[in-house]
Amino acid sequence: MMNSKCGKAFQQRVRDMIPEMRRVRQIHFVGIGGAGMGGIAEVLLNEGYFVTGSDIMESAVTARLTSLGAKIAFSHAAENIDGASVVVVSSAIRADNVEVVAAQERRIPVIQRAQMLAEIMRFRHGIAVAGTHGKTTTTAMISMIYAEAGLDPTFVNGGLVKSAGTNAHLGCSRYLIAEADESDASFLHLQPMVSVVTNIEPDHMETYHGSFEEMKHTYVNFLHNLPFYGLAVLCADDDVLTELTPKVGRQVITYGFSEKADYRIEDYQQTGFQGHYTVITPSGERIDVLLNVPGRHNALNATAALVVAKEEGIGNEAILAALADFQGAGRRFDQLGQFIRPNGKVMLVDDYGHHPTEVGVTIQAARQGWENKRIAMIFQPHRYSRTRDLFDDFVQVLSQVDVLIMLDVYAAGETPIAGADSRSLCRSIRNLGKVDPIFVSDHRQLGEILDQVLQDGDLILAQGAGNVSKIARQLAETWTKE
């Protein structure tokens, strides 16, 4: 689907329209394997820049970038930035990182990931997707629709676009579709033509000084980065977005299950892991949508993508074909297969959701697609600060599964916080009395424990944003696939 449909002459005209960054020849990424960093690096490699980077471990992302010509070191050292014109960092990189300090001493510009994304977007028709949940999947869906329509977009996503086999692609058209990161408020650097906001919930509150009001105000500022002729596409089902809509001084179009939505979803049904529903447009047109990814949340994601495409003049045929063929985004309800275990057959699903709302919709989709079967979850909390801030919500949502296996918190560089660890979560969940969690301090024991508790027909959710995916996939390699 991602094969270019543009001629060489047109490709050259597009390149001529997009100026090179003057005096920039070598671009260095600190933490190049991180979500979003690798995608930007890939686009820049394909634009002809020399890209270097560093990370603490090898990954599929670093392997791909190396194959494209990037030079990557798997440790942090001052000499890694030798020759760099600019150093790009993500919010996960500390200010005292040796490469950041060396760059500052040498007066090499150090910029946020979103600032580099903004430069890529500057001379393109940008479509930015923000929100607490669903932005990776929505970005992937929009990208696939534009590709199906023959528009060959550039896209930069925070997760793998399965049908493209990558999370980034340099297209030959003027369109750029990008996931916008609110975690450090760096999405304020972007100046797109179209902005989508899927929902707003408290998360990454350290960025917003613990103030949800500040976070909401920042989202309004993000939408005001649109030109006066731009378009804001907002979810009508989200109470916070409904509250903020009157404050947005740009054209707004809404979507959702709400009767007040401009593009309204009706008659959603799920059969197995397939969803189908009808969208009623502002003109009264009825559009029947088929999805091969489950859950009402994915119907919302798909409808956001549909709205963007319809409002930008793409026909129904391309929209519906792309959505029907959509294979999902990496680690979003990713079905790893059905396996034969001592007590019977089980299905293993890998999912990135790490916020209580995300975990909840994943459980709901699993219940609808795996009716009358038990849901077993391997959960790995992500960050002590998130566990602390959303502790009670985690207790409630994790109590909805039938079997709960809890791994240690994936710290992501944070210092442990008393009362915000996995053992504390287990105690509170056990006290609620709905499920008796099993704490596993050494993931090497996970396979043995699973074989003790699993039953024939169980669906296993490997849930979290840390290395639980790697753990689950390594486990699956030792299991017999049906």
From Swiss-Prot:
Binding site for ATP: 131-137
A molecular function GO annotation: UDP-N-acetylmuramate-L-alanine ligase activity
GO terms of biological process kind: cell division; cell wall organization; peptidoglycan biosynthetic process; regulation of cell shape
Top-level taxon in the UniProt lineage: Bacteria
UniProt function note: Cell wall formation.
Family as reported in the entry's similarity comment: Belongs to the MurCDEF family.
Protein known as: UDP-N-acetylmuramate--L-alanine ligase
Lineage: Bacteria, Pseudomonadati, Pseudomonadota, Gammaproteobacteria, Pasteurellales
